[in-house]
């Protein structure tokens, strides 16, 4: 299994008494990942620009925690910086830890900070969160606004460095523009289908097809508000979005982006250790073993191989 997004590091930083990366009270830890037969887990460093006076300092603090936790449990987990590292964890049986930034604005439009983030081990950046940030407009802003000139410059630099470009939280016009700027695939790490659940955080059909045609992937988000009208996150709704993405974009576009530990905790899949329930549900819905393997890890693996 490869999961493209979780917010566990934010929770560990803000709630130090809740445990650590090996065992904690949240939905993701090493023990739970091992039960899920995890291959790669992306750990997002999420910075809410509206709640801190020093977003870059907050990023550094969370990054340091993440790197130190991975180091402390090096017999179980390894920071992956290249596809060679990915292949290494496949062979060793360790969990691969991918580190991302959720909120590109934390870098302040500074290309030197972008390069430093790469040196820090960041390999994926979610361009925006829920505020305009000097790079682009969020999903909850003006849909017609394109990326800023600085945003275009950043995206081009990310491609050159080998940092995965993530359009989750970005508005429609900015996402469409990525298709013109990039020569490599881009992703929506934790987004669903707007036609199934009308929410601006979800992707319309034309953008599902665009991401698919670029060779990109879309990680299914488990947040109940992006899935449907149920007050809890239900397996049947996740399956509905997954089947829809396959119908509109093909079986190579769909992946996992749980958003665990960043979404409301009332989820039918209680934590990462129960992910086999989702695998079984997709099989029961008619997907073949090969299609389930693509959804659970092979599509994401292909993307990592192309960009890292």
Where are these regions (language model features)?
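Extended, charged catalytic domains and RNA/DNA-binding interfaces, predominantly
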Residues: 1-220, 225, 243-246, 253, ...
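Soluble non-cytosolic domains of exported or imported proteins
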Residues: 24, 232, 236, 269-273
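Mid-to-C-terminal alpha-helical segments outside catalytic/metal-binding sites
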Residues: 270-308
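A short, acidic, flexible beta-alpha connecting loop/helix-capping segment that sits on the rim
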Residues: 46-48, 262, 296-302
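Short acidic/histidine-rich active-site segments
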Residues: 222, 248-272
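Hydrophobic, well-ordered secondary-structure segments
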Residues: 147-148, 152, 208-217, 222-239, ...
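Short, solvent-exposed loop/turn segments at secondary-structure boundaries
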Residues: 53-55, 198-201, 230-233, 266-269
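Active-site/ligand-binding-proximal alpha/beta "capping" segment
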Residues: 233-251
């Amino acid at each position: 299994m490869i999961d493209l997004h979780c917010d566990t590091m934010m929770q560990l930083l803000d709630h130090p008494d809740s445990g650590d990366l090996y065992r904690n009270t949240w939905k993701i830890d090493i023990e739970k990942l091992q039960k899920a037969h995890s291959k790669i887990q992306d750990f997002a460093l999420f910075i809410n620009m509206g709640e801190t006076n020093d977003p870059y300092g907050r990023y550094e603090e969370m990054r340091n925690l993440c790197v130190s936790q991975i180091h402390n449990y090096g017999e179980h987990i390894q920071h992956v910086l290249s596809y060679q590292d990915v292949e290494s964890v496949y062979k060793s049986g360790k969990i691969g830890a991918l580190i991302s930034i959720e909120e590109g604005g934390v870098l302040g439009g500074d290309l030197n900070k972008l390069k430093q983030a790469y040196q820090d081990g960041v390999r994926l950046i979610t361009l925006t969160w829920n505020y305009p940030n000097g790079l682009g407009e969020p999903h909850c802003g003006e849909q017609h606004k394109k990326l800023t000139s600085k945003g275009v410059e950043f995206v081009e630099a990310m491609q050159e460095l080998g940092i995965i470009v993530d359009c989750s939280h970005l508005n429609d016009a900015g996402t469409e523009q990525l298709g013109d700027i990039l020569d490599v695939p881009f992703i929506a790490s934790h987004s669903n289908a707007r036609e199934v659940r009308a929410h601006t955080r979800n992707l319309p059909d034309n953008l599902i097809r665009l991401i698919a045609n670029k060779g990109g992937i879309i990680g299914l988000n488990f947040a109940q508000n992006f899935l449907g009208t149920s007050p809890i996150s239900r397996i049947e709704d996740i399956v509905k979005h997954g089947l829809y993405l396959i119908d509109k974009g093909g079986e190579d576009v769909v992946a996992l982006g749980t958003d665990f530990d960043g979404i409301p905790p009332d989820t039918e899949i209680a934590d990462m250790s129960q992910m086999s329930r989702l695998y079984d549900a997709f099989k029961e819905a008619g997907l073949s073993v090969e299609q389930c393997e693509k959804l659970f890890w092979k599509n994401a693996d292909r993307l990592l191989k192309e960009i890292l």
